[in-house]
Amino acid sequence: MLAKRIIPCLDVKDGRVVKGMQFVGLRDAGDPVELAKKYSDERADELIFLDISASHEGRKTMVDVIEKTSANITIPFTVGGGINSVDDMKRILRAGADKISLNTAAVLRPELIREGATVFGSQCIVVAIDARSVGEDRWEVYTHGGRNATGRDVIRWAQEAEALGAGEILLTSMDDDGEKKGFGLELTKRVSEAVGIPVIASGGAGLREHFYDVLTQGKADAALAASIFHYDETSIQSVKEYLQTKGVVVRP
């Protein structure tokens, strides 16, 4: 059985880690390279950087962050945000990232998933989906940092992304993001059952128990969190030890 992964997420804006609640109200959480090294030392399985800078300057800063992070950590890391072409992917991977995360750009031009997978391999392509509930057992895909409704069904889009060559799905429940009341279990379970690639659950982690719930009931392959790690509300080690006591296979 494959070990379940615990993944801290770092939202980076103009070279600083920030964390908001339901995609708004950002507050500063620290230096991305320092935080990445801390999580690598604490035995996180992977890291995800999401560049939420709006400006070209901010994007250039991100390449610098990736290069410094790559030199300082020993675990794989994914970078997403503002990646719109194979050239963008090349720039990020050359700077030291292991995987690319595509969100809005993939919804606007799904062929980008295939292009990236063809050049770099499916294992490098993570498709991030921001999902909001629109009724019983129905979720809609949102883009542009959770601002724009697309009318697209989340489960169908996850299946399409897999067919185009995505190697992984990063699934954020917008309804639960930042609330710390638990992951979107039904959403995660439905998507996990609908695709044959790993699903990383995101949005809602507040307690160690929430990780257990989403990795078992939600059938996720990995669970991601931000603020509870950034602000030392719990640690990677504490989450992993708890999961081990509950019989969940994790890397030590």
From Swiss-Prot:
Where this protein primarily resides, as one coarse class? cytoplasm
Give the reactions, separated by semicolons, that this protein catalyses.
Answer: 5-[(5-phospho-1-deoxy-D-ribulos-1-ylimino)methylamino]-1-(5-phospho-beta-D-ribosyl)imidazole-4-carboxamide + L-glutamine = D-erythro-1-(imidazol-4-yl)glycerol 3-phosphate + 5-amino-1-(5-phospho-beta-D-ribosyl)imidazole-4-carboxamide + L-glutamate + H(+)
InterPro entries referenced in this protein's UniProt entry, alphabetically: Aldolase_TIM (IPR013785), His_biosynth (IPR006062), HisF (IPR004651), IGPS_HisA/HisF (IPR050064), RibuloseP-bd_barrel (IPR011060)
Q: Name one GO biological process term.
A: L-histidine biosynthetic process
Offer a single GO CC term for the protein. cytoplasm
Q: Which family does it belong to?
A: Belongs to the HisA/HisF family.
What name is this protein filed under? Imidazole glycerol phosphate synthase subunit HisF
Name the species this protein comes from: Brevibacillus brevis (strain 47 / JCM 6285 / NBRC 100599)
Lineage of this protein's species? Bacteria, Bacillati, Bacillota, Bacilli, Bacillales
Gene that codes for this?
A: hisF
